[in-house]
Every structure is written in structure tokens, then in C-alpha cells.
């Protein structure tokens, strides 16, 4: 990777269908097969209830810190290919899935990118409300700042409701 083009990124990976841990490990493997992507750190696994439908199977989640020379839209397309390769199908929002990958942060910048008839928002617009993202992210990036709100991750964690924190378990 060329030094000046390298961007630090954070991705959230989750699965609530099939062998969840294997799905996530395989997604990590596929990420690293791209010469324009390198994983630096990986959080532990966190088990959380499915949201908003708690009747769906539980999720396993991790966050990874990486480096990439891919542009934001190319990174988005790359991770969507991985999701499809792992069995993800076009379905309703918040449905169960073998693999879900979200871009949490791309070089501490915010993006709204048109993709077909939709927009991609980076960082993920609800990142600050999600315990299953904030806790693993805090584990590997204690000084991370949320670019949308210019807030430290510790400030975001303080605002998570206690009941939400009780629904997540370190594996």
C-alpha cells in the first residue's frame, strides 16, 4: 500500500445466522485477501440480542481496525460482495443475516455518497446508539472520536442506557 493513500478505518462485523463465529472469521479472511486492505486490530466477540426484533437469533459482533487504499465507495462495494459471498440476501431492514459489515469510520471523515438510488452514510448514522458497536470499538480504540458529533467514544458510552448495556456480553 502506498503510504500517502492509506486510510485508517473501523468496520463492524456481525452475524446471527448459521455458525456465527465462523461467518465472522471467514469475512475477516476475505477482507485480508484484498491487497488494498489490512487488519490491524480485532476486538473480542460480543453477544447481543437481535434488534429491534428480540425474537430473532442473537448476534455475535466484533469491530476491526484496518488500513485501506480503497476509496469509500469501493470499500462499501467490497464489503457488500463479502456479505453476499457469505449468503446475505436482499431482505428487509434489520432482518437476520449470515454476515453484516458496516463502515464505522473512514479516516475520521464524514461522507454521504450516492450509490444507485440510495445514499451511503459514513460513519454509520446510528453508531452512537449501538452498544454492540461502541463497546468493541472502545476495546480497540479508546481515544476514538466520532466525526459526526466530534465526541469521544467515552462520552458516547456514557449516554448508552443501562438497560442496553445489560443486553451485551463479552464472549
What positions do the PLM features span?
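Residues at alpha-helix caps and immediate loop-helix transition turns in enzyme cores, especially N-
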Residues: 23-24, 145
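Short N-terminal binding/cap micro-motifs at the start of the first secondary-structure element
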Residues: 19-21
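Short, surface-exposed acidic-centric catalytic microdomains
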Residues: 26-72
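Flexible, gly/pro- and Lys/Arg-enriched active-site loops
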Residues: 50-59, 70-77, 81-171
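A structural signal for short, well-ordered beta-strand segments
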Residues: 13, 42, 62-64, 101-105
Amino acid at each position: 500500500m502506498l503510504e500517502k493513500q492509506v486510510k485508517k478505518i473501523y468496520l463492524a462485523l456481525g452475524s446471527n445466522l448459521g455458525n456465527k463465529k465462523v461467518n465472522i472469521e471467514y469475512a475477516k479472511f476475505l477482507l485480508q485477501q484484498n491487497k488494498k486492505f489490512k487488519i490491524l486490530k480485532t476486538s473480542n466477540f460480543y453477544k447481543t440480542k437481535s434488534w429491534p426484533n428480540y425474537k430473532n437469533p442473537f448476534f455475535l459482533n466484533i469491530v476491526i481496525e484496518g488500513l485501506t487504499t480503497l476509496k469509500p465507495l469501493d470499500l462499501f462495494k467490497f464489503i457488500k460482495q463479502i456479505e453476499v459471498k457469505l449468503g446475505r440476501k436482499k431482505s428487509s431492514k434489520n432482518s437476520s443475516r449470515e454476515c453484516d459489515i458496516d463502515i464505522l469510520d473512514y479516516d475520521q471523515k464524514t461522507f454521504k455518497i450516492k450509490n444507485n438510488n440510495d445514499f451511503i452514510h459514513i460513519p454509520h448514522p446510528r453508531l452512537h446508539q449501538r452498544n454492540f458497536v461502541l463497546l468493541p470499538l472502545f476495546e480497540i480504540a479508546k481515544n476514538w472520536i466520532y466525526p459526526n458529533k466530534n465526541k469521544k467514544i467515552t462520552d458516547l458510552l456514557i449516554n448508552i442506557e443501562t438497560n442496553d448495556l445489560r443486553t451485551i456480553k463479552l464472549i
